[in-house]
Amino acid sequence: MIFGTNGNNRMTKLAGALVLTLAAASSAHAAIQVGGGATLPALGYVGNVTHRLNSAPTSTSLFGAYKTVFANNGASYCQTGSGAGKNILAGVSGTNVQNGCPDGSATPTGFGATTVGRTTLTQPNFAASDSPLSSTDYSNYVTGRGASRPLQFPAVAGGIAVVYRNDNSTTTLNLTTAQVCGIFSGTITTWSALGQPLPISGNDTLQVVFRSDGSGTSFGLSNFLSANCPADGAGHHFITDQAFSNAVSQYGLPGSTWSGQSGNANVVNAIVNGTTDGFIGYAEAANALAVAGNIATVNGKSPTADLGDATNHKLAISSSDVVYNNAISGVDSNGRPIVSPISGAPTTSCIALVKPDAYATLAPSVSGYPIVAVSYLLGNSQGNGTDATDTRNLLGAPYNASVVAATKTIGAGKGLAFLSAPITQTQINGCVIN
């Protein structure tokens, strides 16, 4: 749903009172971890995404389980999108951790620290992003945070779903890779070309909804598209980028029948809850599940039922797929991301990047849903102060057996999966210095 526009007035007032109560309580303890960023993992992290800002995650969400296991004051989370989240962590001009996190279509410039009682906090405790640090992101951080350096660890994976609404369709839309390529390159423009009936609206044109903000969901989708969709006759191809308008720019898109929305929840709302049908787009699967949106299968696989391996529902990331102190430095002539060493990076193993090639195309031995994003938790090496222990534990929560066991919002059928990756709590502890 679109942030803050649904629900009755009484519930809205009660929610506001709850936020004020939580803010007063956290002010006394001054230990709630303040962060935000990616919308893709938000349901898994906090359990409820009715509002952009959630300072009371459900007990079975990742952050709720983290609070219970470590008996601390938990974490607040503001859904800004990956690009804005990285900028707020870096202290880019015009952003501030204290700035509000209001509902609506505008992308926030802060994580709402004032709202949750952390009025003296000068930098976020953490951020989340589904697009890994780029060279520009790293440079922005060094400029904004001085002696500190960013930390980055892969946390979870999400299935990127093709969400649609055709009220005359009676069966699940099953797309091939070629059809996914065609929809987002603009070569398939009608429902009839997909073998689907005319929507109730009477308009056969596919009305594509995309992410208008800097988005790790867009990065994940374009990573799949640039790896699996051949160039057209004119040599046009997809570009892996967190800005969807860049990803499809060679095709002269977005087009006049396409519309942009900020955040996964707003994309899903535009597709599912409009006054008419005929819309199609992409969003993290958990967001579509939350509002009972129609989710297409791709090559017969579901982004909820077939995400990760069939046994423990985790996405396997081998040690050879993780590189340290590298960042995305651009794209090659085929639109594939270039991973390069960071100039002036620390020698520690604190900036971990999963090679985009590792999840752009499934290995022949893997039978699962093919469009996947890897989401990261980010932090600061310096300036953590009395929050250091809580921040260490939060960044390591996706690898803590007790936290994982208590988390019910990530796993089988949820559209989100934990990772089997070579990251340890000891490693993270050594990265959060003070």
Question: What are the roles of these predicted feature ranges?
Answer:
Residues 30-434:
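Flexible loop/hinge segments at secondary-structure junctions
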Residues 1-29:
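Gram-negative bacterial Sec-dependent N-terminal signal peptides
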